[in-house]
Design a protein with these regions (language model features):
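Enzymes that bind and transform nitrogen-containing heteroaromatic metabolites
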Residues: 1-190
């Protein structure tokens, strides 16, 4: 069982624009043409921060619509937040706060032998790494640059560096890089 940060990034290392938009990403290809279907089939639990969850509410669930969307994950999802957020009917969403270590133990139990997916922004992922709980980073690098935005991971990883496990082409718009993460505390970059 591994804890994985699986995400898409611009070539210059941003996962979203400065205003948290992902609109740059959608024209680049169909999600089903990436490794996502195989990846999500191996996931047993998810974790995300409040900003990612709120993005999901606004862009996927759309609770104010006449026919709101459904939560896209069958797996239990832990949302790290310090404020009260609305739930989604029929979804196994668990709102938590505090250190990632105790929650990670709950996630491991729920995931059994399947992977834990750290969804969304790099700050929560950084907390998992700082606690020695991040095993892999899988980045689908898009063939665009944003110039500025939300960074892939707001941490310095230099000593020891990540270990490249694989690199592969995914259609004309993406390459996928898979890295193993060494168990060492990182320096924070602001």
């Amino acid at each position: 069982m591994t804890t994985q940060y699986y995400t898409a990034s611009s070539l210059d290392g941003f996962i979203a624009t400065e205003d948290h938009s992902l609109e740059w990403l959608f024209p680049l290809g169909d999600l089903n043409d990436t490794g996502y279907p195989d990846f999500i089939a191996q996931v047993g639990a998810l974790a995300m921060g409040a900003s990612t969850y709120e993005w999901m509410l606004r862009h996927v669930i759309k609770p104010a619509d006449a026919t709101p969307g459904t939560w896209p994950y069958a797996q239990p999802t832990w949302v790290f937040t310090s404020r009260e957020l609305p739930g989604v009917a029929g979804a196994d969403i668990r709102f938590v706060q505090g250190a990632v270590g105790p929650v990670h133990r709950q996630m491991r139990a729920a995931a059994a032998d399947r992977a834990i997916w750290l969804v969304g922004g790099g700050e929560l992922v950084g907390q998992f790494h700082d606690a020695g709980l991040l095993d892999e980073i899988i980045v689908q690098v898009a063939s665009v640059t944003l110039g500025a935005g939300r960074p892939l991971l707001p941490r310095r990883i230099t000593n020891p560096p990540l270990q490249l496990l694989s690199a592969r082409l995914i259609g004309p718009g993406f390459s996928e890089l898979r890295y193993a993460v060494a168990k060492q505390t990182l320096e924070r970059t602001e």
